[in-house]
Every structure is written in structure tokens, then in C-alpha cells.
Amino acid sequence: MVSRFPSARRGPAILSLALVLSCVIATASATDTDGIDFSELYEQAEFAAAAYRPEAEIRALAEERGYTLTLHHTLEATQVAFFLATGEAAKTQLISIRGTSNVVNAMLDISVKLKPDADTGLRLHEGFAAAAKQVFEEVKPLLLQGYRIRLTGHSLGGAVASILALYLDKAGFDLARVVTFGQPKFTNIAGAAEFRRIDLIRVVTPADLVPLLPPFDPLDIKDLDVYWHAGTEVVLLADTEYAVLDGIDSMLRATRFTRQTLSEENLAYHRMALYLEMIAPKTGGAVRVPYPTDFNIFNIFGG
């Protein structure tokens, strides 16, 4: 195999990567990894899946779970849909954000370079941040004082929900745990560090490629501006088993798939139906296991 990263440039790149890894050690998530409740994850998955359904079905699920549907809307420019539901008894409001209907086209069309965000000072994916700002402006007048806010979303909607959590946090709203499913990356290492105070769980299936996007590019190492996941990654394994990964470990998992291409065929591993199916047996009791890895640092550079 011919390396896509010339050997003469590997040395400096690996040194830069070592610096990146040393910086990331301090970016642990605020999530209590011993407090993962799969019944909670299943309910959030139901709400994430509901964002793809007609309004009548969203309303029915919300009422079944003790909520009233407050708003259901689709952003015209991006076709990202979301809903806001209010639970008076629990004094909780829930925001669920849908991804796009065609993930392959959406992920191929996005600009992969991060852009500075004036509101947060962070470098964020421009399209996801723009959608999050639109949702923020629409829900802000409907958010109630003294209520906690739950956020969830699938695919691109998960990335939008995560950025929305940052905007809400900075605006002083009380956030509950944020749970996303199959979410792509949306910021860099500095941005991930800013998320330490937010309890963010990213649920993934082992063969879902969307959470590995945009792909790791070793050429960005020199600028310490590589795309990086925020929060804690929960990997759904067979039956009752699961693994938990943070920053470095999550990145190392991604390097095993850097040469695979997103296609309609492997999107079967990305669908919410599979996420619900894999979470269900864990609601009665789950077993945390180590995530197997055969990582080799030279694999990043095509060696």
C-alpha cells in the first residue's frame, strides 16, 4: 500500500499528534460514566426517532411520556426538523432534532473546514452551528423559568443538538443530560474542552461511519485543528454489553475505519431502528466491557 502521508513528513506529524494527545488528556467529559441509565437512553432514543415522524405521532409519544407538544417546526433552509415538548409535572422541557432525509448527500456536501463562531469563540462546523442558532432563536421564547432542558437528536440533528446545548448553557438555562445518536463531529480539541461542563452522551453502534465524520486528516495536525468529538462515547455492543470511550480512545476507534466510504449500504448501521434495537436489551441490566482495539499510530499516516 502506498502511504498517503510521505514518510519524510511523518516524524513532525507524529510529534504534533503526541502534543495533541497530551493536550486532550485534560479534556475529560463531565459525564458520570458509572451513571449511564439505559432506560433513559432508550427514552431519549424514542424521542430522537420521533423527530422523523408525523406531528400526530410525535404528539402521541409526548403525551404518553408525560409531555405536551409545544412546537414542531422544520427549518426551511436546511430541512432540519425539531420539536419542543413540555412536561409540567417533572418541570422539564425536551428538544429533539432530526437529521436530514439523505445523510449520504448531506455529508458529502458539507464544508469540512471549521469556522470561528462569534457567539462562543469556538471553531465549529458552520452549517451545524447555523442550524443550532436558528433552533435557539425559535425555542428561546418558549422555554420556561425553573424547567430543566433535555436535548436529543440523531445524525446531523445530534450535532445540532450538541451545539444548541452550548448556546443554552451560555444563556444560563438549566441543562439535563444531552443524549445524541450517530452524531458526526462538529468542533476541534479546544471546542471539545469547552464541553467539559456539559453532560453529553454520544451513543454509537460499532459499524456506524457517520460518527467518524468528517474523517481524520493528519494534515490538520500541524495546526492542532483536527475535528474532535466532545462528550463521552457509549458504544452499543451485542446483547447487554457496551463500552465507554472518551477523547483519545474515541479518536483511536475512528482510525480503524478511515479508509471506508460512507454509502447507502453501511447506513443500515446508522438508522434509529437499530439503535433502539441495541439499547432495548440493556434496559434490564447492562455490562460494561473494554472496547477491543489494535491501534497503530502509523495507521493514521497510511503506513
Model-predicted regions and their roles:
Residues 2-15:
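Bacterial N-terminal signal peptides that target proteins for export
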Residues 29-152, 156-303:
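Non-catalytic, mobile gating and regulatory segments of ester bond hydrolases
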Residues 14-24:
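Bacterial N-terminal signal peptides
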